[in-house]
Structures are given as structure tokens and as C-alpha cells.
Amino acid sequence: MATSLVFLLLVTLTFSASTLISAKSNATIIESTCKTTNYYKFCVSALKSDPRSPTADTKGLAAIMVGVGMTNATSTATYLAGNLSATVNDAVLKKVLQDCSEKYTLAADSLRLTIQDLDNEAYDYASMHVLAAQDYPNVCRNMFRRVKGLAYPVEIRRREASLRRICGVVSGILDRLVE
Amino acid sequence: MAASVDPLVVGRVIGDVLDMFIPTANMSVYFGPKHITNGCEIKPSTAVNPPKVNISGHSDELYTLVMTDPDAPSPSEPNMREWVHWIVVDIPGGTNPSRGKEILPYMEPRPPVGIHRYILVLFRQNSPVGLMVQQPPSRANFSTRMFAGHFDLGLPVATVYFNAQKEPASRRR
């Protein structure tokens, strides 16, 4: 009984030790990949919280990050179309919100194309598609700016900054892949 | 006349983006202290902010400035030609783009692969354009020729282009 317990303990310890070792070596890939971006801490925390990252290579990490961006862009498009523009009575603001929602949908589409580019290892295309995704939220902000007296909502500003940061990380990782 | 547009022909700016034209205006472009002459090399890190552009002409004339990259995403496979970086309209003659209406905000050159040409094209407008021009839906697959045709801008009155490529990693951080 005691020996089998000891045996079980040894097996458990060995298993967790080897998991720790392989997890640690891939943590190094995540860290070195994120070092090439301008948002190291954000990059590391976003990647580490994804279950696929321990076994991903640099290209895989880029894809994970693009996925994070797609989630952000799609949820922002939904937020703008569904929640916000439906509750607004001002016709001008409603139109701006609907147009903005469209832009964030286009950003998500661009990021979807980026995943395809990554699959095809067409990193130059991927770079341009990420640039486009990063640019669409600017268009939304400018639409607010063009209307006199219309304030740019804080929540949209926060989401815009978030998407820009995510795209910045992807661009950084792509730079490394192209080299 | 041909001699003054030769670099643009040699650089295939005329052909890939523009049709043959006779320059009738002056445009000076500076990134910081660096004066842009056709085909000069610019580091993307020095072009993060829009260049200083001064144009000739009378204050009652209005001009449009377009900055475009025909070599996106790479010069060997420019399937996204052109990638438009900046559009400013209704610039009064003798002034600069800050006095015009920025239709599309400046986006810095970020050439992912290869050496890209970045072309600044100046048009003289026949009438104010500001309210009619919408931001293009996407920066990719822009056509300067079609844009000029759509807003009746005619042929360019001045053009200058520079080259840029990605800087080595050690410089960018």
C-alpha cells in the first residue's frame, strides 16, 4: 500500500515536473516573441491566458493574437449596432453609430484575412491586412469628430485603444516572422 | 518639358499611378530637415508624422494632395495597389495641407516587404470639393487616376516620390 502510494507520488511529481519544463520552454518563446512588440506585458498576458499558447510557434502566437483582435472588433461592432444605436433617439448619432459598427465589422474581416495570410505564410499581405484592421477604428473616431458638438464616447475610445494595441502586437510579431 | 518628369517616368510613377503630365506648380516636401527629391530614400521612423508640404499658387486656387503607395504589399506582388496614405482637399494655393480639409488622415509608411515608392501628387481643383468627398471605404486598392477623374481634378500639377523600406530591427525599438 505504502509503496504504491510512493510510486503514485513519484509519477505525479515526475509528470508535473516535465509539464513545468515544457511549459517553461514555451514561456520563453512567448517572452522572446513579445519582446519584439511595443506592448510586452500586454502581449505576454494575452498569450499566456490562451490554452493553445504553450504548444504554439511564433506563427501560431500571431494567429492567437489575431483571434483576440477579431473578438474585440466583433464585440465592438455588436455593441455599437445592437446595444447603443438601438437605444438612441438622435438620428445623427444613430447613423454615426451604425457606420462605426460597420467599420469594426470590416476590421474583423481584415483580421480574418490575416489568419488566411498566416496560413499561407504570406506575411506581407498579413502586415497590410493588420494595418487596415488598425485603421478602421480611426475612421469611426473621425466620423464622430466631423459632427459638431458630438462627443466621442469613452467606451468606444477604450475599445479603439484596445484594438490598436492588439494590432500593434500582431504587427510586431509579423515583423519578426518576416525577418 | 519631358526632362522635368524623367525621374517619374524612370521610376514608373508615370505608368503605374499617373499619366504623363506637365508640372505647372511647385511643391516642396520635407520630413524634418530632409528635403524630398524624386527617388530619395526615407526611413519610415522619420516619416511617422505627416511631412511639411508647401505649394505654390494663388490663394484663390484650391489644391488636392494625395499620398499613395503602388507597391503594397510588396513591389513584386502589388496586389493591393494602391494603398492610399493621405488625402487633403481644398488646400488654398501658396499654403500647406494644414489649411485644407483632411479627407483621409495621414498614415505613415510601413512597408512590410521590399522597397516601396511613396508618391505625393498635387492636383489643382476646379471648384471646392470638401463636402462632396467621402473617406474611401478602404485604403487598399485605391486608384489615384479614378479619384482624380471622379472629382474632375484633371492631370497632376506637381508630383514627387520617395522610396522607403523596413528598417533593421535594431533601429526600430
Curated annotation (Swiss-Prot), chain B:
Query: Quick one: a GO cellular component term?
Result: cytoplasm
What the entry lists under PROSITE patterns is as follows: PBP (PS01220)
Q: What's an example GO BP annotation here?
A: positive regulation of seed germination
Tissue specificity annotation: Expressed in gametophytes and developing seeds.
Q: Where in the cell is it found?
A: Cytoplasm
Keywords per UniProt: Abscisic acid signaling pathway, Acetylation, Cytoplasm
**What is the protein's name according to its record?**
Protein MOTHER of FT and TFL1
Q: Output the lineage of the source organism.
A: Eukaryota, Viridiplantae, Streptophyta, Embryophyta, Tracheophyta
